[in-house]
């Protein structure tokens, strides 16, 4: 759906896997790098790119998006398939930050929230994960049961931003 200069589309991220490292996480980080070529993200950050991404998701939890997790990770982390639990969209366009400003209590200006930054936050009343993947592009994940509500809230905000001209 495109309204004004902003587009929202469903994002197929492939397999979504919650990884909760055991211990200090160093062995997990090495295993993740060896298995998938991805660094373990620091809090508030994401690593990788489309097709293979790792998002900080919470304290001692990351979300591997894309590949099926390598079996070697099971020795270093709790590995849980979350693929059917999340709805994922990409919000993009020159007014994307303005749309998010109407819905999310996070400063998404590019000087503050740079490419590769990620936040667990709220979109209105919905728990969400938002990651900046490009200059004007954001990956948004909400619980699957909230997919319709997310699209509705984004549409209302997109219409409001577009009406400003």
Say what each PLM segment does.
Residues 1-165:
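Basic, glycine/lysine-rich polyanion-binding surfaces/domains
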């Amino acid at each position: 759906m495109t309204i004004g200069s902003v587009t929202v589309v469903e994002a197929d991220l492939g397999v979504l896997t919650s990884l909760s490292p055991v211990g200090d996480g160093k062995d997990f980080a090495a295993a993740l790098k060896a298995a998938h070529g991805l660094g373990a993200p620091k809090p508030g950050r994401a690593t990788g790119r489309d097709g293979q991404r790792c998002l900080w998701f919470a304290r001692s939890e990351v979300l591997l998006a894309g590949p099926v997790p390598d079996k070697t990770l099971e020795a270093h982390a709790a590995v849980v398939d979350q693929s059917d639990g999340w709805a994922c969209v990409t919000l993009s366009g020159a007014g994307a930050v303005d749309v998010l400003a109407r819905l999310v209590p996070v400063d998404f200006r590019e000087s503050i929230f740079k490419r590769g930054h990620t936040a667990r936050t709220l979109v209105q009343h919905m728990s969400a994960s938002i990651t900046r993947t490009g200059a004007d592009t954001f990956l948004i994940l909400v619980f699957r049961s909230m997919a319709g509500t997310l699209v509705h809230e984004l549409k209302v905000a997109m219409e409001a931003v577009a009406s400003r001209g």
